[in-house]
């Protein structure tokens, strides 16, 4: 989806791979100046080669203090995509404190922190903005082994609504994109069992999983003025799964 974001500055977390990486590339092509945030420096090096001029930031968003040091002075941002996430699979009864804490620190707490940093700057500058939280279909339905992960995404749904309510008076829109399994490295690991993948795909009326481009297009739409009256909402990129 071709949009024009010329003159705007965007920040994308989880920018090293998959949805985040392709979002950075799409925003770059569309004229935005992009701050790309990920914890893997090698991914930033290759991304900078693909998208000359982006601003790479290497930080583990699961670390509150490190995130504050890295992004506290990031400067003016008009568009924010909270995409960073980990999918740590463990049965509910076996879920460890380490897995629980890591899941919530990266998937939810970092969204809270980075959004605070960006929104405060938007308000101080007196400019409108758009924030998109990359959630998941499992914010509404879940599967065995995803207790921690799906809990973070369910909480993100309410965080998105709360942010939209409180930031709306400042002309800051907040929405989420909630995809089904996306054919990224993370998505392929979740469906590495062929039988599980077959059964899961059959529950989608369109008999397919999502491509990265499908999710990126929804993110771009929500970032753009084409969704100027949309806030506190979720777009489900799920091939009809919830309808079934």
Swiss-Prot record:
InterPro entries: L-xylulose/Carbonyl_redctase (IPR051737), NAD(P)-bd_dom_sf (IPR036291), Sc_DH/Rdtase_CS (IPR020904), SDR_fam (IPR002347)
GO cellular component: a single term: mitochondrial matrix
Key words, A-Z: Allosteric enzyme, Mitochondrion, NAD, NADP, Oxidoreductase, Phosphoprotein
Reactions that this protein is recorded to catalyse: a secondary alcohol + NADP(+) = a ketone + NADPH + H(+)
SUPFAM superfamilies, per the entry: NAD(P)-binding Rossmann-fold domains
Stimuli inducing this protein: By glucocorticoids.
Compartments reported by the entry: Mitochondrion matrix
Top-level taxon of the source organism: Eukaryota
Enzyme Commission code(s) on record: 1.1.1.184
Tissue expression notes: Lung (ciliated cells, non-ciliated bronchiolar cells and type-II alveolar pneumocytes). Low expression in all extrapulmonary tissues, including adipose tissue.
Catalytic site: 149 (proton acceptor)
Enzyme class: oxidoreductase
Phosphoserine modified-residue sites: 176
Keyword Transferase among UniProt keywords: no
A molecular-function term among this protein's GO annotations: carbonyl reductase (NADPH) activity
Gene Ontology terms: biological process: glucose metabolic process; xylulose metabolic process
Residues annotated as transmembrane: none
Activity regulation statement: Allosteric enzyme exhibiting negative cooperativity. Activated 2-5 fold by fatty acids.
PROSITE patterns: ADH_SHORT
Binding site for NADP(+): 11-39
Subunit structure: Homotetramer.
Family designation: Belongs to the short-chain dehydrogenases/reductases (SDR) family.
Stated role: May function in the pulmonary metabolism of endogenous carbonyl compounds, such as aliphatic aldehydes and ketones derived from lipid peroxidation, 3-ketosteroids and fatty aldehydes, as well as in xenobiotic metabolism.
General remark: Uses both NADP and NAD as substrates. Has a strong preference for NADP.
Protein name listed in UniProt: Carbonyl reductase [NADPH] 2
Organism of origin: Sus scrofa (Pig)
Name of the gene this protein is made from: CBR2
């Amino acid at each position: 989806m071709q949009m024009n974001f010329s003159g705007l500055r965007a920040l994308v977390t989880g920018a090293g791979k998959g949805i985040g990486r392709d979002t950075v590339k799409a925003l770059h092509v569309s004229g935005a100046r992009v701050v790309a945030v990920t914890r893997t420096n090698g991914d930033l090096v290759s991304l900078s080669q693909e998208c000359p001029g982006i601003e790479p930031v290497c930080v583990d968003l699961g670390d509150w203090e490190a995130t504050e040091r890295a992004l506290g002075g990031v400067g003016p941002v008009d568009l924010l995509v909270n995409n960073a996430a980990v999918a740590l699979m463990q049965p509910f009864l076996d879920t460890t404190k380490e897995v629980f804490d890591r899941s919530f620190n990266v998937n939810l707490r970092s969204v809270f922190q980075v959004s605070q940093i960006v929104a405060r700057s938007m308000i101080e500058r007196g400019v409108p903005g758009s924030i998109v939280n990359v959630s998941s279909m499992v914010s509404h339905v879940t599967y065995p082994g995803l207790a921690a992960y799906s809990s973070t995404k369910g909480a993100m749904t309410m965080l998105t609504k709360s942010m939209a309510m409180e930031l709306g008076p400042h002309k800051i829109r907040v929405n989420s994109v909630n995809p089904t399994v996306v054919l990224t490295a993370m998505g392929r690991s979740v469906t590495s069992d062929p039988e599980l993948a077959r059964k899961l795909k059959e529950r989608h009326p369109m008999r397919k999983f999502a491509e990265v481009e499908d999710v990126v297009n929804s993110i771009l739409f929500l970032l753009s003025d084409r969704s100027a009256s949309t806030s506190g909402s979720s777009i489900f990129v799920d091939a009809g799964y919830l309808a079934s």
